């Protein structure tokens, strides 16, 4: 996730610190008011999750059953850590027996059972470091990575789709057979080459927009279920696209 470190923001102001309205632009004031009144933000605070994004993963899992039985999980773009919290609980991960590896270029407060790497996933050393941290083939690769937005929709889409593609190829490289891949993408179309690659390597590929994803947001999630293994038949015919929900 492309978010500020926990406990503060890029301005250095502590979370929860009151700000004089006169110093805020109208758009910033509206964002703060929406955030404070967001029922998912309130639920996250009540249930101990670090971000409302936890409910996106939980809602997707409620329908698609991707978390049950997972023994190892890799979380890409993990900060501030709500998906890693869920992953650690699902895998019964502990500091003595860590089964979750997470990565983000932003800081992230420690989570019991999660090995966190503060580095850019696009760093050439990142994939190998994650493999070593997880200690075996993961059953799930999660990616909530998104490039910082520029305000230009096409540019933002291209940059985030690049992260999605890199994450997808990493998933195919490391997943255990039968594993799943879930990644953030933006509305505007998923590149055909990426969809074809996923269709060749997974048994089902769908686009998902959970209810907890804000209606005005362009984000969606690409879910690839049932990894066929690295010996998938080359003769498998790729589908034309992913189903949408």
UniProtKB/Swiss-Prot annotation:
Region described as Disordered: spans on this chain: 1-25
- Known SUPFAM superfamilies for this protein? S-adenosyl-L-methionine-dependent methyltransferases
Which annotated residues bind S-adenosyl-L-methionine? Answer: 81, 83, 104, 120, 144
Q: Superkingdom of the source?
A: Bacteria
Question: CDD domains from the entry?
Answer: AdoMet_MTases (cd02440)
Ranges of Basic residues composition bias in the record: 11-25
Report one GO cellular component: cytoplasm
Protein keywords:
Cytoplasm, Methyltransferase, rRNA processing, S-adenosyl-L-methionine, Transferase
- State a single Gene Ontology molecular function: rRNA (uridine-2'-O-)-methyltransferase activity
Q: Where in the cell is it found?
A: Cytoplasm
Reaction(s) this enzyme catalyzes, per UniProt: uridine(2552) in 23S rRNA + S-adenosyl-L-methionine = 2'-O-methyluridine(2552) in 23S rRNA + S-adenosyl-L-homocysteine + H(+)
Give yes or no: UniProt keyword Methyltransferase: yes
Where is it mainly found? cytoplasm
Q: Which InterPro entries match?
A: RNA_methyltr_RlmE, RNA_MeTrfase_FtsJ_dom, rRNA-MeTfrase_E, SAM-dependent_MTases_sf
UniProt-annotated catalytic positions = 184 (proton acceptor)
Q: Return the EC number.
A: 2.1.1.166
Cited Pfam families: FtsJ
Q: Which PANTHER family match?
A: RIBOSOMAL RNA METHYLTRANSFERASE, RRNA METHYLTRANSFERASE 2, MITOCHONDRIAL
What the protein does comes down to: Specifically methylates the uridine in position 2552 of 23S rRNA at the 2'-O position of the ribose in the fully assembled 50S ribosomal subunit.
Which protein family is named in the record? Answer: Belongs to the class I-like SAM-binding methyltransferase superfamily. RNA methyltransferase RlmE family.
Name of the protein in question: Ribosomal RNA large subunit methyltransferase E
Q: Which organism is it from?
A: Rhizobium meliloti (strain 1021)
Q: What is the lineage of its organism?
A: Bacteria, Pseudomonadati, Pseudomonadota, Alphaproteobacteria, Hyphomicrobiales
Name of the gene encoding the protein in the UniProt record: rlmE
């Amino acid at each position: 996730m492309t978010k500020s470190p926990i406990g503060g923001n890029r301005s250095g102001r502590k979370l929860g610190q009151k700000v004089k309205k006169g110093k805020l632009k109208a758009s910033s004031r509206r964002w703060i008011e929406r955030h404070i009144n967001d029922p998912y933000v309130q639920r996250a605070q009540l249930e101990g999750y670090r971000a409302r994004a936890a409910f996106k993963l939980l809602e997707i899992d409620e329908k698609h059953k991707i978390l049950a039985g997972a023994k190892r999980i890799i979380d890409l773009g993990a900060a501030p850590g709500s998906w890693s919290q869920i992953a650690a609980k699902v895998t019964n991960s502990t500091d003595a027996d860590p089964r979750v590896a997470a990565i983000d270029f932003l800081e992230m407060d420690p989570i019991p059972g999660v090995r966190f790497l503060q580095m850019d996933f696009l760093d050439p050393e990142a994939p190998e470091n994650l493999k070593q941290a997880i200690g075996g083939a993961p059953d799930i690769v999660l990616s909530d990575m998104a490039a910082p937005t520029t305000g230009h929709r096409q540019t933002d889409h291209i940059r985030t789709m690049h992260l999605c593609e890199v994450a997808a190829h990493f998933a195919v490289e490391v997943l255990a057979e039968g594993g799943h891949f879930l990644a953030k993408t933006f509305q505007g179309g998923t590149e055909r080459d990426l969809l074809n690659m996923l269709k060749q390597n997974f048994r089902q590929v769908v686009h998902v927009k959970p209810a907890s994803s804000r209606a005005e947001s362009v984000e969606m999630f690409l879910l690839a279920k049932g990894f066929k293994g690295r010996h998938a038949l080359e003769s498998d015919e790729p589908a034309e696209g992913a189903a949408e929900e």
